[in-house]
């Protein structure tokens, strides 16, 4: 549908009637990138998960039969949900505060009066006034004036662009110098930045080994749980001396044992603690699981601005070609023009000496066309800028010097001339500038190198400039660079990402393609960014990191936000991630033992004509002493080793031997119980005892190498378990020990060690053979290629 456009006088702007019509037609600007989840959305998404729904159904079953003491497992579910809600809400509040702080007001002219309006109050065809230093919030056509515009936020290119009457200034850019009056051309989704953001509306699944493993376990169990529940309940109900209460309690005991609710809580808790630690280092974490992803990262893609450099220039040296004080001349020019581009700021910071004592007649503003700026005084004309544009044919005299300087620096030529036409121009000297490297950048880059993490620098700037910056920041001398304009196809990008370290003149779309290509090569990729031009790549990356000084769109799509925009936080984030994930992986084996043996037992007891050997409250003792407390304490130990391998295979390798051993023990106990005519309470007591004992064998292995803390942990947990068996019999429904029970216990202890070691040995050999076969297959494929 075509929209009727207004053409207001730039000195008057829209009138009240025209503005009202725009509001009625909903032609009002809004920022689609700035919305965060509502509190209601956060609650609903965290409460109604498949994991929670399964446990709620089981708890309802327990409540219906009145066995309230067996509801202890729901405490874990509630805690886990609360942690997730609180963490996500904290992130939302911090983001909303950042938005309020960074939200710019816009000077809008209506009915001849200039007022500062919010972003969402601007309407189509409004007349807006843009001055030096302003951010452009909507696509605007210049109606009067001219300006130098910095579009690096949206394109990555640091060179300013000259804009004049009739030109379009894109939203997301900044006015570096000059003042213009413009008319709003696009609003809302039609703005350039909004179109980029809209390309990222799909939700990319979080690349988390732990989350994927937990989801895989829960989804598998959810498919099995209904048929198992029906069959097991039927079997338990029609046993001799059984009733509906016993059948429900026994069935729920089997089913909750299959669900690793403790592992979910441990993971959420430990990650939440990591989030709190990182917040003290000014790091905002959106997604708990991105800490794990960052711990697994082997490639980090950086933009030079805001990470390696501070986003500003610095004067390095002054090369005089005359006796004149060029500092006073530069200071005079900078004061007169009051430009805000990075070069002008660096010159003003360096040259704050006494100004040139001459009267200014005319200012010569910088433009990308003339490439210099200056002043005309009552005595001379003084200019500074690009040597080739000032000297023209006279440049040959200084060619060797300039070529030497430009290898490492941006060269500003300072000259005097007789008039503004630069007649009889004389070189007074050269000022050498360069991008200011962050003091912490070399140490940060060196840390990643030592940790085996590859760095890729992706920028919209000239590749030679970016390469020099990379080398100054301490990257190795033999790194290679490429101009991304030469990468025409996906195949070109696939080949380039493995060979080159520095990518220059990269478009926003190419940044995304580079990230995808690295992932296709099997890498786990982290991406840092601050501009709208980084949004597409940030959404594709396995772990996305934004600077707080960046756009709202960038901060909202990123999993981590560096609140002080300090890249030196990265090593600490990685260390925290590695400590957290390594320890969760180690502790997870304790939890998955229960999931494995409970799943096998649930299937077996569909066919075995005996009551399920546990009730929920009994499993609580074994779980707390061999899993809950030990895993929680072990998860906070220091551990900076790089995370390798797949989470689930790594964990199952440790969990399967004790789980199968527990199943064998329980089968032995059932057989002996049938022969010796032991009661159900005696059978369940023996089952809990041997389940706990076998779990302690695994805990012993997990605690190695022992230190004082681990010795105390293991000893105290063993005593707690024994105390529960002996002194808390009534609470946990245990029986006193008889001679047949003692005999059965001794037999099971012996068989536990035998079967544990046997299964561990078989599993180890099987994995080694599988690894060899995989390696041989890989070699065969390479030979064929």
What are these regions (language model features)?
Residues 3-4, 13-16, 103-212, 410, ...:
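Cytosolic catalytic regions of P-type ion-transporting ATPases
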